[in-house]
Curated annotation (Swiss-Prot):
Entry's localization field: Secreted; Host cell
GO cellular component, one term: extracellular region
Amino acid composition bias (Low complexity), ranges on this chain: 1-20
Outcome of mutating residue 162 to A: Translocated into the host plant cell but loses the ability to trigger host cell death
Effect of residue 112 to A: Translocated into the host plant cell but loses the ability to trigger host cell death
Protein's name according to its UniProt entry: Type III effector protein HopBA1
Length: 239
């Protein structure tokens, strides 16, 4: 169980006084308590909008979503918006969801298979687990007319174009949440999209609590006082 992953290290209980200074009042930051599942569910309980910064290829994060799905639903989460699906492919994705994990994995493979079969399998399982728990799962990404980058300069330009998608992501997530009258939403996408988010949440997106990860296996879940890229760090070990 993921709640046990970092149990060998005591959870850090950090005063949120200095960390909370200047933070948008709609973002509620509390010291993590318990293991990774409890920390994620607690963040969702305290906030109407949570951003999960993914590290593509790392298995811990989709495994955490899978284990947390039922508890997230019980905490009031109605909507999971994900980078892994184009918003325009919503109908086809929902059909794949209804057909189960293998269909979802096949649906995602062309765009995300480069991050490894094991990771793709865990992401597919996480999306299906959320769906089975009664959480509405939607895609928020947009097609880009650009080839995969090869040179360092191409990679820089590619990332700039990717980060410019935050406006489109937010519009899609807002639209889908409104369609199902969601009270609480989680947006799950690449951590780079949620950088410099300490004050108001991610750039060009609605204010919300941002979660990042420490997957060294040596840390503990904590309020992020080290940088401006998230509010809470969930500790675990990728395996």
């Amino acid at each position: 169980m993921l709640n046990r992953i970092s149990s060998s290290s005591p959870t850090s209980y950090v005063s949120s006084g200095s960390s909370s200074a200047g933070i948008n009042p709609s973002i509620n930051v509390r010291p993590p308590r318990g293991g990774p599942v409890d920390t994620l569910v607690g963040a969702a309980s305290d906030n109407n909008l949570v951003y999960i910064g993914d590290e593509h290829g790392k298995l811990f994060i989709p495994k955490l979503i899978t284990e947390s799905a039922a508890k997230l639903k019980n905490a009031g989460v109605d909507h999971l918006a994900v980078e892994f699906v184009k918003h325009s492919d919503g109908a086809a994705f929902r059909e794949a969801l209804s057909d189960g994990k293998s269909a979802v994995k096949h649906f995602l493979e062309a765009s995300w298979g480069r991050h490894g079969d094991a990771w793709l399998d865990k992401v597919s399982e996480a999306l299906c687990s959320a769906h089975r728990a009664g959480i509405y799962v939607s895609g928020i990404d947009r097609k880009m007319a650009i080839d995969q980058p090869k040179t360092p300069m191409q990679k820089i330009l590619y990332m700039k174009k990717r980060l410019a998608l935050n406006v489109a992501w937010d519009a899609a997530a807002t639209r889908e949440a409104s369609a199902v009258c969601a009270n609480k939403s989680i947006v799950w996408g690449g951590a780079g999209h949620f950088s410099n988010s300490k004050t108001d949440g991610p750039k060009d997106m609605r204010p919300g609590l941002v979660i990042s990860f420490d997957l060294t296996g040596r840390g503990s879940s904590r309020i992020n006082d080290a940088d401006e890229h998230s509010h809470i760090v969930i500790a675990g070990e990728d395996n």
